[in-house]
């Protein structure tokens, strides 16, 4: 998967289109990413005991994963943020390196 944990991405489709955020977690098997502040959903939790004490029930707002095809990587070039696709190249030692397709720079 071309998007990794710690990358800054922009949502390109859906209810949060245009929002930017940092990738909190990546799930390559499901091809989904968890983006900070994007795709917030409300979960209804039941009160119950936990190891540290009692857990309060109620409605909790949290982020839900979104499909990786709905986000694009954001890179910085000359002080401006640029939305780009990701490609790969191999260096002299055979290591795989991610490349921003729009700027041509290594990520």
UniProtKB/Swiss-Prot annotation:
An annotated GO cellular component: ribonucleoprotein complex
rRNA-binding is among the record's keywords: yes
Keywords: Ribonucleoprotein, Ribosomal protein, RNA-binding, rRNA-binding
A single BP term in Gene Ontology: translation
One protein family per Pfam: ribosomal_L24
Lineage top rank: taxon: Bacteria
GO molecular function, one term: structural constituent of ribosome
Keyword presence, RNA-binding: yes
Stated family: Belongs to the universal ribosomal protein uL24 family.
General function of this protein: One of two assembly initiator proteins, it binds directly to the 5'-end of the 23S rRNA, where it nucleates assembly of the 50S subunit. One of the proteins that surrounds the polypeptide exit tunnel on the outside of the subunit.
Subunit structure: Part of the 50S ribosomal subunit.
Protein name: Large ribosomal subunit protein uL24
Organism: Streptomyces avermitilis (strain ATCC 31267 / DSM 46492 / JCM 5070 / NBRC 14893 / NCIMB 12804 / NRRL 8165 / MA-4680)
Organism ancestry: Bacteria, Bacillati, Actinomycetota, Actinomycetes, Kitasatosporales
């Amino acid at each position: 998967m071309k998007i990794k944990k710690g990358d800054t991405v922009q949502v390109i489709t859906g209810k949060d289109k245009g929002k930017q955020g940092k990738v909190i977690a990546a799930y390559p098997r499901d091809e989904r990413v968890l983006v900070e502040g994007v795709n917030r959903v409300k979960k209804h939790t039941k009160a119950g005991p936990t190891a540290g004490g009692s857990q309060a029930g109620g409605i909790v707002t949290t982020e839900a994963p979104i499909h990786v095809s709905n986000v694009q990587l954001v890179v910085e070039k000359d002080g401006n943020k640029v939305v780009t696709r990701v490609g790969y190249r191999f260096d002299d030692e055979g290591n795989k390196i991610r490349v921003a397709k729009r700027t041509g720079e290594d990520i």
